[in-house]
Amino acid sequence: MSALKKLLAAALISTVLSFCSFGPTLEKDESARAIFDAENDQVILPLDAYNTDGKDEYFTKALELARKKCFAEHGQHYKMFVRTEGAGRNFGRTYGIWNVEYAQKYGLHKSDDSNTLDLSSPAPSSDPGKDVSTECYQRASDEMKQIGEIPFGSATYRRLETDARNAAGDQQLKKSLDDEWKRCVKDKGLTPDSEVTVKESKNIPQSATPSEEEIRIAVIQAQCNQDVGRSQKLYDLEAQYQKPLVAKNQAALENELKEFKRRDEQFKQYVLDNQ
């Protein structure tokens, strides 16, 4: 192979590898910003309007009612899961704790007092050979399938969320912000052991009432996040890639959201008849 051919081949390989590494360049709207809802400790991005995680109105309740009915037939109590607004969503801690006011109230952990789910093992059945939990979960699932189609989340939403996050994956920016955050918490007496955690938090037990030490550690982490602007800058970057994607794919997003709601509506009558 001549020197020229070798040079051209190397250039071609370099181009292919470059494309594989970074993927297609997406449109970016520099004006887009993530919304930081401090009261609810949530970060809201443009695509979130189409995120169906935790937003079914009837299906989950119908499934839980079917389970409860089955347990009652076996003379056992079943504590139903009560879904709260937005349950199941990413609450905005991808880049660490950022909400100082929330950290002052709840420490390192999220407040989840409005969700109830009894995960304890049920009492033994009157029939020693029967696993009531397994039977009732399967029966409830089968009953739901007979009623209608299970509401699933939007495939378009998932794809666009992944595309935007990949496009926003500026590792140089993230590393710079991570390093600044680590220096900040270290200057305040903590020992960073990852990009979002400190060594001192490992021995803090999760409890309904956070200790003074837990609150101190959480506040330092959140304050450093705000001082450095880590969550703000990285979520803003995601929002800037999400906004044009939403505009270009709005019809598909709207249609899949309508389909989700249509499927969920099929379980309304079951809820009304059994609650």
Please describe what each predicted stretch is.
Residues S21-Q275:
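Cell-envelope/extracellular polymer assembly enzymes that use nucleotide-activated donors
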Residues V16-F19:
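C-terminal motif of bacterial Sec signal peptides marking the signal peptidase cleavage site
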Residues I13:
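Arg/Lys-rich, alpha-helical DNA-contact motif
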Residues M1-L8:
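Bacterial N-terminal signal peptides that target proteins for export
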